[in-house]
Amino acid sequence: MTRGVLAVACLIGAAAIAHAQQRPDVSGNWMLNGGKTTFAEWHLTDAGDRRFKAYDYKKDDPALKCIGTSWTRVWLNPNVLVKVTQNPTDVRLQYEWMDIDRRIPLVDPTAARLKRSLPIPNMPGLGTSVAWYDGDALVIETRDIEPGYVSTMQEWAGLPQSRMMRTIERLSLANPNLLSIQITHVDPANYRDPLQVTITYPRSKFELMHYGCDPKDAQITEPNK
């Protein structure tokens, strides 16, 4: 090997190492129990306000049919694990709730064409996603979302989403044992400005389990307002 080729090889290797070091390590098992959830103040359009007020938890909650309606709704579920695995070409997020298995390609977000994830079976509200790293955060961008609800829980139940919805999740470590998930929902059909949600997940020693949702076992529960 010539000195020039060796120098180039060393530079490429050093760049690869530096790039790898820039990737935050958010892998592991995480659970919402003990974490916090914060919804920033939302500003609905007239159409969004009508949809929000028309929500009927007795019949409109997709979870009654074992369907996750948005990534915020999926992250909001307590007492269930999320396992994050970082691979060289993709990231995998396994949600115990509804047994959702999410495999997202890692991409260059500036590229003209991006390879997106496959849709989650029977969950059109979850769209398709791509992921990349930005400083200390894993960023996940989702679009191709069907109309539904950002949340069906607590005072946020019925916050709507349209086909115009674009979701950005930023996963980073608040500390070595606390995962911060910052979610931005951009949906001009329903919101006058982006809806911001922050959820924190403590690290968990539990292992992933099978959820096995069955609509026949669904229980209708009135959201806490």
Each model region followed by its residue ranges:
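N-terminal secretory signal peptides that target proteins for export/translocation
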Residues: 1-2
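PEST-like low-complexity, intrinsically disordered acidic/proline/serine-rich tracts
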Residues: 20-225
